[in-house]
Amino acid sequence: IPLIKKIINNKNNQVIITFFSPSGYENFKYNNNQIFKTYIPLDFNKNAKDFLYIINPKHAIFVKYDLWMNFIEICHKNKIPTTVFSGKFHNKQWYFKFYGQWAKNILKNLTNIFTIDKASNDFLRSEGFQNVTFNGDTRYDQVNTNLINSSLKIKSPCLILGSSWVKEEKILSNVIDKFPDIQYIIAPHEVNKKRLNELQIIFGSKSKFYSQIDFSKEIPNILIIDKIGLLSDLYSLSDIAFVGGGFTGKLHNIIEPAAKGNKIIFGPNHKKFPEAQLMIDNEIALTIKDEFDLMEILKSIKRSNTNRKKSIEFVLNKKGATEIVYKAIMNKN
């Protein structure tokens, strides 16, 4: 989104965004007459030729792992500049195996490759790539570090369980009674009748739904969010964010709570997410494997402006990746 916004700042530019899955297509909503969305056909040579002939792009942009080899090759043959950003590369990917050499050679024809981490940059250079730049993660440019005021009477310290699944919820529920002075906010990844019923069972009678609270009074100790679209603002109110997905290898957004100054907690399966290890290395995030790890963290929880500032500064220092990609794209058009 940050890159798209920069491109359409010029009223002469138009962007076609392609999707392969119906869920991605249907969930993307952006009301602007410079932006169009469509499905991308299967990555066959003829499909790529026909599709690119119809849309006639000035520049083709690929994100992360969505590397469509026939499309990249046809772009190269037709002298259409190509850019990959937020790329992550390593020796276990198929195009760096002996049977993927043909794909590796196609990737070398990309005009620009911007990597999300230095390890990817160094690996590509060791494989003979020249068109590589390490610029970081454009998602840092998308988050806002400004804190919001809220009518919720939240006590401090506050822990928010964000984008949670049952695994994280059960871990937290096992320690809540041991730390009654902490405010708990539960924001599940899915908000539907089945999940809300599960949450009521897990957290019991001491919990209350957001839709039931009286804003003029202090909220209950365990608040369950049963409305979508609130999580980003709620991170402004919390001190610690326990983010879901870290036990399944599908870690949810940890950049957003860091931008609001939270200390971050997540499960141990985070290898696919370079930002997770970066935050651990910078001491603004911790990983846990069970309720006992969580208890050790909660024993020392306190509201600290120093900790909040450290998380926000981490995010601010990572901003700027979008501008680098944008300038490269505009210079090639």
What are these regions (language model features)?
Residues 1-333:
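Nucleotide-activated sugar donor-binding and catalytic core shared by glycosyltransferases
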